């Protein structure tokens, strides 16, 4: 990359590509005066840059003491009570204060009350990002047909009626659990009508009813008045049964059902951190420009396939007619969060008054919130957050002091962008050892804006290895999956989250299923995440989101979480 030209803005030197993007694309339409923006940005860097550096120095100071303590043990068996006292004495393990509940307000239903899958997608890939946003709805027929959920994968690129029949049988068997019928199964339904805005089902000459008729939400018809789909609901998740007698699947189905559309990726994290490499200014501008397209609702992508140009755009919402005859809007897009980088890295895109690189996390905080104003202040069209919030996930924070720092930074950003306090909602990744053991106090530091906590096996075990490197040989990383402490870490995250009042106000998440081709294994195993009381879990693809969504049909996470409220939060970590 050629060396960037820098533009002076107050006490900052800003790489020209970034400066041009902010002044020509991000600021126009945001309602923020450019002079106020640069003044606020400059003051934030001057105030919080030195604090950021001191926090990193404290990390190194604590690590040096822990390594020295282990070296002093010289290989002898560790006395856990002595070790715990040592961690407390150096300020690594902090005392827990009184119980409290979070005060987060104005969260969207997908964050607070509707459990479901969560996608993570690299923000620099517009095509993948659009696919993720549109994965709010996924075809169950396609997901099962194209994966190994049935025990095998397709052996041909041409459609197999035999495999298709197995897919339909699997899907209708799931419908029997999702929305059971009175003395009938979905495979026996032969006619579907809407009569006076109500669902009418038949099996031959026999009328059939839903066991719970309140599960019927509404329907859609085409311009000729022909029924095209009807909508059911369970555990706040919708399912659209699509009808088309002319479709290759529908024409062979006794009720002309051609697909089952599952409400799948309720939320998506668009990622500026682990899944991308945004080192140079041009990389960061690409990331921010795609975020701007999402917040404006106009992100698009084109690619070539088999000699043809394919265009991708964001889906529209879906309007249905309810049993009362009134219209109802179902969201067509996943609710978006954006993951900023943590406190560690600096960026060459902006230099401070001393000519030093500023913290990349500070730049992300300012730029991603500024861009989100295009959604927050929009008066018409499809909004990301109907509650006027922006959701930012902060990764790799070490303990309550670093969470407090992030909270203070967001306070300052809200002030100079002149938006309501706590508009920015924070997600805390519980992936560092000092955060895990002080999780309750971490949550307390962001109690008015926290909207998400999540565990992560790879980063958490990585920090365990790094912190305790001098303690002696470690288990192979893969073997750690089966240790007591990993289970305790996962359980304790849920227990503390619930004890701090996250239920109904925030997400309690579980980590990624990284094996994208092993959907049968995921179908068998990942149901453990909703069973744990967590109300979201990460998935790697729209197909995985569709399959994992079925788990939330089978498990009432809200009910499970109430049972966890009676459990102790001091499980061994």
Positions of PLM-derived features:
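Gly/Pro-rich turn-and-neighbor structural signature
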Residues: 398-457, 466, 470-473
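Catalytic alpha/beta active-site cores
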Residues: 2-4, 85, 89-405, 412-419, ...
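Charge-patterned, long linear interaction tracts outside catalytic cores
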Residues: 500-558
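Short acidic, glycine/serine/threonine-rich loops at helix termini
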Residues: 252-254, 346-351, 404-405, 436-442, ...
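N-terminal-proximal low-complexity accessory segments that begin disordered
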Residues: 2-73, 85-94
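Catalytic alpha/beta core domains of metabolic enzymes, predominantly
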Residues: 454, 460, 465-515, 527-532
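Hydrophobic faces of well-ordered beta-strands that scaffold small-molecule active sites
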Residues: 337, 393, 426-428, 451-455, ...
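Conserved small/polar residues in nucleotide/adenosyl-binding loops
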Residues: 563-569
